[in-house]
């Protein structure tokens, strides 16, 4: 018997060691180099924005967490190895057939490498993983109270939001660390002879037994702690088959006691395991572990299953009633749907209305939105693009401004950005791409309630948006013909200009002006960026770093870069906000607005949690999906939340990229915690200027989440909630080309939050009855500064047509389909239905409005820009249809109903040009042919009796005769035609 001699490992030559070190250095450089470059670039970028404290706080937190986790985990594993080695048997039996001997020799030959390298590698891996949880740790350190306690344990919700996730993280790391130490100790004892196996027998040294048993005992103790924490996590747990989130009857009366029992059993088992140290009998801990396993199966799984099947399911509505009430209360609190925010009012939805009542709703009828921002983008591009490299997004935005008469109006708005992907030929050269074509030019707004001219008139090319433009004019001065004055219309930052792989522009004074700005009849004018934004690029260090970052040698050799040069990058507004506020989830919709004569992008930011007790866990991607998101591939990343607040409003200056964060929700505990983590980065709500407040709108994604939850959580009675009989549904988009839910719409209409006739900017949505196509409710979210965030829900008790039924009634009406069939005959024009708006009018009625567009040909090519040709409406079961809002309203309610509707803007016979005071460069490429003139449409109700149809034909003939007489100047014939028209209208009104 003796110690087996260790086999010597072959030694490496000095040359081999040098080559290995060089290879390792190259590998480290390849792995770490890009990260070091990115870190340095981020240091510069955050500093330029004024948010370097965010970068340093995140970096310091990540480094500290990585080091602490690495040292702790690696140290525990090292301890397991070191103990096994230090207590190894002095003499190991020598056996020729010992399979462990060769491994023992290898380990002994490289003892330091194995003993330190393995724990170090494990610690490094653990640290890298742990640093990704930096936010959880910061919330634990800075989180406060919610001021609300959970209904089961009476703990403040801050415990669940900030403390419990941290405790669970620490417990997970301790379990993994001790388990790895156990494995390392076990393997080390086996290699060094503390554990010997021979056939069916084996031997275990005392030190091996003590160490392994101790580690198992610690694991069992940690499992007992896990059972204790499991109790709290039950409150955000979802059991299969439950219609609500949180602990139900089975969880409280079976699972919760089971967790306590299992915790007690785990403590007993831990004592049994530790007893093996003194008793030298491994059967006792083995029995304890088997008992723990069986208990977890019987007590932890079997008993709750029996309670669920025998006691709960036969009486589920009564048994779960208390817990459903908890879920209703918590979900309303977590998603901002409490009674101080949401106001419910009964609304008939089908009350009869007179022409006078409709006309009196001036705030609604004068603001009926005709322009669909998902359809009119090609028209913006055709008439306002100017050059091939300017571009508008496929889906435009809606905002509101005061018109020249001081009336609140909604506008379809867009920034004319530069799209690098549309550069062609020599424009794609590196110098042109990054130093010449650097910015967009112009803010375009179109009143959403009107168009230029009537498409029904064959002598006019009407139906197109009326464009109000802020742009750099032909003489180099800023022309502000838009809805608000703008000092600087050049756009260096935006979602379109940043939508490319090489998102950067090199700007700054270096000799003559280089940047393309605008054209005159004589030459092209250049410009030099003068904004404060941008990272200095003049030094050789900066040039070298950015050359490496973008893999572009021109940074080093191009003479267009001088001492005053700057580089603009990371130009997407939402991404800039997410970078300086990494704790925010941003809304999918970013929109431009003129604020204090500056063009800014407004970004909505959310704080979220995923473990709010009893609050329903919601998938953001599912809740926010609608037909627009699907069509434009703008779905938000999947994220589960059970708490959400629109806590931050952010602005990004379109010229210099300045990011400003404003506190929107002053009560949000999550935001307060982050404001302590990053002090000074979020400005108080009081700093929001009135000019900015006038353009803040209720965020779309939040509204979609809330309407989905209101479909269930408007119910107060838990028994009714359980039966789902009074639930609502988000309606599907009735448009035949849509494939998802109907999106909410921003409109200006009468203020239903105040229940008066003042104009209000709102975000609205209809709600259907559960699995039905009839209306159940109408939801409006106010964006007015005085009532911002108030939700008004009009509950509709009767059987009122929902969006799908209204759309079916409009599109299948014989007169409508016949008229549109003529317009689209032989694929001359492509007919498109716009957004179907639901508008409360009169006192108790709901008016459906759906604009109709046509574009040349049957394709959806970009050149086929659409124009408005008809307006369709439905009120109760009656359909109105005409070239204008006034015509459709008159057809529905009679003469005078459209008196307060906004009239059509004048136009000329030709295609409307860009505003004369501010002509952009002419659009490149040939102009597409105009839409074939639509035939006159019958004005009036289209659900008609034969007598009314005959009367309408007479009306149409009389109108035609009057037009002909007017053109010829035959006043006698004109008077006769008017008399026949009056008689025909009388026949129409008298017809049954």
Curated annotation (Swiss-Prot):
The chain crosses the membrane at residues 17-39, 59-81, 113-135, 169-191, 212-229, 255-277, 284-306. Keywords: Cell membrane, Membrane, Transmembrane, Transmembrane helix. It is a multi-pass membrane protein. Residues 912-938 have a biased composition (Pro residues). It comes from the Bacteria. Its main location: membrane. One of its GO terms (cellular component) is peptidoglycan-based cell wall. It is found in: Cell membrane. Residues 906-938 are annotated as: Disordered. Belongs to the UPF0182 family. This is UPF0182 protein Rv3193c.
């Amino acid at each position: 018997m003796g110690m087996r001699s260790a086999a010597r490992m072959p030694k490496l030559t000095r040359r081999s060691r040098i080559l290995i070190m060089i290879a390792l250095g190259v590998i480290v450089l390849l792995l770490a180099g890009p990260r070091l470059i990115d870190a340095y670039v981020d240091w510069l970028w955050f500093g330029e924005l004024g948010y370097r404290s965010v970068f340093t706080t995140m970096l310091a937190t990540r480094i500290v967490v990585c080091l602490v986790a690495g040292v702790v985990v690696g140290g525990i594993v090292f301890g397991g190895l070191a103990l096994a080695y230090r207590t190894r048997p002095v003499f190991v039996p020598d056996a020729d057939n010992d399979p462990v001997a060769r491994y023992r020799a290898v380990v002994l030959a490289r003892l330091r490498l194995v003993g330190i390298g393995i724990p170090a590698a494990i610690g490094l891996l653990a640290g890298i993983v742990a640093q990704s949880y930096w936010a959880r740790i910061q919330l634990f350190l800075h989180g406060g109270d919610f001021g609300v306690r959970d209904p089961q344990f009476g703990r403040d919700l801050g415990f669940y939001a900030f403390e419990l996730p941290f405790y669970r993280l620490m417990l997970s790391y301790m379990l993994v660390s001790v388990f790895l130490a156990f494995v390392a100790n076990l393997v080390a004892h086996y290699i060094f002879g503390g554990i010997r196996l021979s056939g069916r027998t084996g031997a275990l040294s005392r030190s091996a037994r003590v160490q392994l048993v101790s580690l198992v005992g610690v694991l069992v103790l940690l499992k007992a702690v896990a059972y204790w924490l499991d109790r709290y996590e039950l409150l955000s747990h979802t059991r299969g088959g439950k219609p609500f989130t949180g602990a139900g009857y089975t969880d409280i009366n079976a699972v919760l006691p089971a967790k306590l029992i299992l915790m007690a059993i785990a403590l007993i088992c831990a004592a049994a395991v530790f007893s093996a140290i003194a008793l030298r009998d491994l059967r006792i801990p083995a029995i304890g572990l088997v008992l723990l396993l069986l208990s977890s199966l019987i007590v932890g799984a079997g008993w709750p299953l029996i309670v669920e099947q025998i006691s709960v399911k036969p009486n589920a509505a009564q048994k779960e009633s208390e817990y459903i009430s908890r879920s209703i209360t918590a979900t309303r609190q977590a998603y901002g749907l409490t009674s101080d925010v949401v106001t419910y009012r009964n609304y008939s939805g089908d009350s009869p209305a007179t022409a006078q009542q409709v006309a009196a709703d001036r705030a609604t009828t004068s603001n009926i939105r005709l322009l669909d921002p998902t359809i009119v983008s090609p028209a913006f591009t055709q008439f306002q693009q100017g050059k091939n490299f300017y571009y508008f997004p496929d889906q435009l935005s809606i905002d509101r401004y005061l018109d020249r008469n001081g009336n609140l109006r909604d506008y379809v708005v867009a920034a004319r950005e530069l799209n690098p992907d549309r550069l062609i030929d020599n424009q794609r050269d590196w110098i042109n791409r990054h130093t010449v074509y650097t910015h967009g030019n112009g803010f375009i707004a179109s009143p959403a309630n009107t168009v230029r001219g009537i498409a029904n008139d064959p002598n006019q090319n009407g139906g197109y948006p009326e464009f109000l433009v802020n742009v750099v004019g032909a003489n180099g001065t800023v022309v502000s013909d838009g809805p608000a004055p703008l000092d600087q219309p050049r756009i260096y930052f935006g979602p379109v200009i940043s939508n490319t792989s090489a998102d950067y522009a090199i700007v700054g004074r270096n000799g003559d002006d280089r940047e393309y700005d605008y054209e005159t009849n004589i030459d092209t004018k250049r410009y030099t960026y003068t904004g404060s934004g941008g990272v200095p690029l003049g030094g050789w260090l900066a040039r070298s770093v950015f050359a490496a970052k973008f893999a572009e040698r021109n940074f080093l050799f191009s003479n267009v870069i001088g001492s005053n040069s700057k580089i603009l990058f990371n130009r997407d507004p939402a991404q800039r906000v997410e970078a300086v506020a990494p704790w925010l989830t941003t809304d999918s919709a970013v929109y431009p607005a003129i604020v204090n004569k500056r063009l800014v992008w407004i970004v909505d930011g959310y704080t979220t949690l995923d473990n709010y007790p009893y609050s329903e866990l919601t998938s953001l991607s599912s809740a926010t999906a609608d037909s627009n998101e699907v069509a434009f591939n703008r779905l938000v990343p999947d994220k589960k939340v059970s708490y959400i607040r629109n806590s931050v409003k952010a602005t990004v200056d379109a010229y210099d990229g300045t990011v400003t964060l404003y506190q929107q929700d002053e009560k949000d505990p999550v935001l307060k915690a982050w404001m302590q983590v990053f002090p000074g980065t979020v400005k108080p709500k009081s700093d929001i200027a009135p000019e900015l407040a006038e353009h803040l709108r209720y965020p779309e994604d939040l509204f979609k989440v809330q309407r989905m939850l209101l479909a269930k959580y408007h119910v107060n009675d838990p028994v009714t909630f359980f039966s789902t009989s009074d639930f609502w549904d988000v309606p599907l988009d009735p448009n035949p080309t849509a494939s998802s839910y109907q999106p909410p719409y921003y409109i200006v209409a009468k203020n239903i939050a105040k229940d008066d006739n003042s104009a209000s900017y709102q975000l609205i949505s209809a709600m259907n009855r559960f699995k039905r196509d009839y209306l159940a409710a109408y939801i409006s979210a106010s964006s007015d500064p005085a009532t911002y965030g108030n939700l008004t829900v009009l509950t509709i008790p009767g059987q009122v047509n929902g969006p799908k039924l209204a759309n079916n009634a409009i599109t299948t009406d014989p007169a409508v389909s016949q008229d549109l069939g003529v317009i689209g005959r032989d694929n001359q024009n492509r007919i498109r239905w716009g957004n179907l708006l639901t508008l409360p009018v009169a006192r108790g009625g709901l008016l459906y409005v759906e604009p109709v567009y046509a574009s040349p040909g049957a394709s959806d090519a970009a050149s086929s820009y659409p124009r408005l040709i008809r307006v369709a409406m439905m009120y109760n079961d009656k359909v109105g249809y005409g070239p204008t809002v006034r015509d459709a309203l008159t057809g529905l309610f009679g003469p005078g109903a459209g008196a307060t509707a906004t009239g059509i803007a004048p136009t000329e016979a030709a295609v409307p040009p860009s505003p004369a005071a501010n002509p952009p460069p002419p659009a490149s490429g040939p102009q597409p042919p105009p839409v074939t003139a639509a035939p006159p449409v019958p004005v009036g109700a289209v659900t008609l009796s034969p007598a009314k149809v005959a009367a309408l034909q007479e009306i149409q003939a009389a109108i035609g005769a009057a037009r002909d007489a007017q053109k010829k100047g035959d006043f006698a014939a004109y008077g006769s035609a008017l008399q026949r028209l009056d008689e025909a209208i009388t026949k129409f009104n008298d017809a049954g």
